[in-house]
Amino acid sequence: MVDKRESYTKEDLLASGRGELFGAKGPQLPAPSMLMMDRVVKMTETGGNFDKGYVEAELDINPELWFFGCHFIGDPVMPGCLGLDAMWQLVGFYLGWLGGEGKGRALGVGEVKFTGQVLPSAKKVTYRIHFKRIVNRRLVMGLADGEVLVDGRVIYTANDLKVGLFQDTSAF
């Protein structure tokens, strides 16, 4: 039985990465440094733009984060692909929260737009995921739209984020 709380701490997210939060068969978040959030502040089965579920999470920004030292030297910026990956991470986390089992894999995205950037001077990144559909058959899959905000301003949008949970990934 999954402990369906509305919020999760950093330690909870790290436990997910170790396979302890959703059980041995549940999806896992990545371990640091690829874990792209510090906390989940809201999870609901209703709500969001489509009233089919909503997740909101946050990442605290500081100039010492690993990617600022290498992307780019003299012009540090968080890679946009990390924000996109964070949204996929949250779709998979939500599927585990619903009780889905399997290994999470990103399956695609319909459209991504970048209209801003995350600099070392930023304070906080917020991720908002609005679920459109959950498929719970042989393949468990989530379909959602997402937004990335830096200090309250939308800088990335993604439509039709897709994540599936697989029992066996050997042929994937």
UniProtKB/Swiss-Prot annotation:
The keyword Transcription does not apply. It is found in: Cytoplasm. Its EC number is 4.2.1.59, 5.3.3.14. Signal peptide: none annotated. GO terms for biological process: unsaturated fatty acid biosynthetic process. GO terms for molecular function: (3R)-hydroxyacyl-[acyl-carrier-protein] dehydratase activity; trans-2-decenoyl-acyl-carrier-protein isomerase activity. Pfam families: FabA. Pathway: Lipid metabolism; fatty acid biosynthesis. The active site is at H71. Homodimer. Belongs to the thioester dehydratase family. FabA subfamily. The gene is fabA. It catalyses: a (3R)-hydroxyacyl-[ACP] = a (2E)-enoyl-[ACP] + H2O; (3R)-hydroxydecanoyl-[ACP] = (2E)-decenoyl-[ACP] + H2O; (2E)-decenoyl-[ACP] = (3Z)-decenoyl-[ACP]. Keywords: Cytoplasm, Fatty acid biosynthesis, Fatty acid metabolism, Isomerase, Lipid biosynthesis, Lipid metabolism, Lyase. GO terms for cellular component: cytoplasm. Necessary for the introduction of cis unsaturation into fatty acids. Catalyzes the dehydration of (3R)-3-hydroxydecanoyl-ACP to E-(2)-decenoyl-ACP and then its isomerization to Z-(3)-decenoyl-ACP. Can catalyze the dehydratase reaction for beta-hydroxyacyl-ACPs with saturated chain lengths up to 16:0, being most active on intermediate chain length. This is 3-hydroxydecanoyl-[acyl-carrier-protein] dehydratase.
